[in-house]
C-alpha cells in the first residue's frame, strides 16, 4: 500500500505543487437549501477566496464519493449515500487565521494527522452553525474539505477528471 501511495504521489507531484495554496470544500446534499448553501459560502469566504464553484454532475459525484478520502458519504440516518453536490474551490489566505475550534495541539495532530492548514477547520464551525440555524433530528455533516495539497489534487481529479491538471495550470 505504501508503494502504491508513493507511486501516486510521484505521478501527481507537479499538480501538488500547483495546489499548495488551494482548498476544496464539497457541499453535500444535506446542505439542502439555497439559504444553507449561501451560509456555507459566506462562512467559507471569511477565511478563503473562492475562485470557482462547480455543480457536480452524476459522474463527478460518483468519482468524488469513490476517489476521495473523507466526506462521510454513508450516514446511519438514511438508507442511500449522501451525495456531494457542489465543489467550492478556494485560494487559502496568505496567513492562517486563529484556530477556529478549541482543540489542543496534541488532539489536533491525532484527529487530523494529514492537516496542512488549520483554516480548513472552519468546516466544523460551518457544520455547527448550520445545525444551529436549521436543526434536524440528527446533525448534518453539510460539507467535506481537503486537508492538504495532495487531497486537493485528488478531489480536483475526481471533479474534473482528466482536466484537473489543466485547471491547476490556470
Where are the model-predicted features located?
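Non-catalytic terminal and connector segments of soluble metabolic enzymes
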Residues: 1-170
Amino acid at each position: 500500500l505504501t508503494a502504491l501511495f508513493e507511486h501516486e504521489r510521484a505521478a501527481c507531484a507537479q499538480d501538488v505543487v500547483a495546489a499548495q495554496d488551494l482548498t476544496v470544500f464539497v457541499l453535500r446534499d444535506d446542505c439542502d437549501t439555497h439559504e444553507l448553501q449561501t451560509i456555507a459560502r459566506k462562512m467559507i469566504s471569511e477565511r478563503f477566496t473562492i475562485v470557482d464553484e462547480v455543480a457536480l454532475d452524476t459522474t463527478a459525484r460518483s468519482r468524488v464519493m469513490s476517489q476521495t478520502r473523507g466526506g462521510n458519504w454513508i450516514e446511519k440516518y438514511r438508507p442511500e449515500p449522501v451525495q456531494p453536490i457542489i465543489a467550492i474551490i478556494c485560494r487559502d489566505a496568505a496567513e492562517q487565521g486563529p484556530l477556529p475550534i478549541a482543540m489542543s495541539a496534541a488532539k489536533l495532530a491525532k484527529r487530523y494527522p494529514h492537516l496542512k492548514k488549520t483554516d480548513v477547520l472552519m468546516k466544523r464551525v460551518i457544520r455547527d452553525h448550520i445545525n444551529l440555524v436549521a436543526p434536524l433530528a440528527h446533525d448534518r455533516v453539510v460539507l467535506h474539505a481537503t486537508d492538504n495539497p495532495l487531497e486537493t489534487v485528488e478531489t480536483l481529479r475526481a471533479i474534473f477528471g482528466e482536466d484537473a491538471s489543466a485547471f491547476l495550470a490556470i
